[in-house]
């Protein structure tokens, strides 16, 4: 084996093994208990929505309010990178986007915490949800 091959072969193996060892990072709309955080209208003004939960499974998104009323829609994966995942969204005949990412916080004492964030952007409103990282 030449010196060139002695260097290239281990580098190639490292690259391949790094890809094989990747685990699920949780950046997906599915598999989380999404709870309502806040909402704004298209002008950026806060909306007073009842408490909502959001569930996503197999391309179907369901929003449920505190009275048990539901809205359903569909989503499809559009783009994924290391920091977030973007979906096309249709909810009760409105089209928009859904974005899943991680929000990091630093408190006054310097302590840090993180949570998953789901942002539903529709023409008339944007709704923010959160989910624990431990899920």
List where the protein language model places each region.
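Short, solvent-exposed coil/turn segments at beta-strand boundaries
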Residues: 52-61, 103-117
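An anionic, turn-rich surface loop/hairpin at beta-sheet edges
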Residues: 82-109
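Bacterial signal peptide processing site
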Residues: 21-23
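N-terminal glycine/threonine-rich, aromatic-flanked beta-hairpin/loop signature
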Residues: 45-86
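Bacterial N-terminal signal peptides that target proteins for export
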Residues: 1-8
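C-terminal motif of bacterial Sec signal peptides marking the signal peptidase cleavage site
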Residues: 16-19
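Tryptophan-anchored aromatic micro-motifs
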Residues: 25-46, 75
């Amino acid at each position: 084996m030449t010196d060139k091959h002695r260097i290239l072969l281990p580098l190639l193996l490292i690259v391949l093994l790094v890809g094989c060892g990747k685990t699920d990072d949780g950046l997906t709309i599915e598999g989380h208990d999404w709870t309502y955080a806040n909402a704004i209208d298209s002008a950026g003004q806060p909306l007073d929505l009842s408490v909502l939960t959001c569930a996503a499974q197999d391309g179907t998104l369901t929003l449920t309010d505190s009275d048990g009323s539901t809205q359903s829609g569909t989503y499809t994966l559009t783009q994924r990178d290391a920091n977030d995942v973007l979906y096309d969204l249709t909810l009760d005949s409105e089209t928009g986007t859904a974005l899943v990412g991680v929000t990091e916080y630093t408190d006054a004492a310097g302590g840090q915490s993180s949570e998953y964030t789901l942002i539903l952007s529709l023409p008339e409103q944007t709704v923010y949800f959160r989910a624990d990282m431990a899920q």
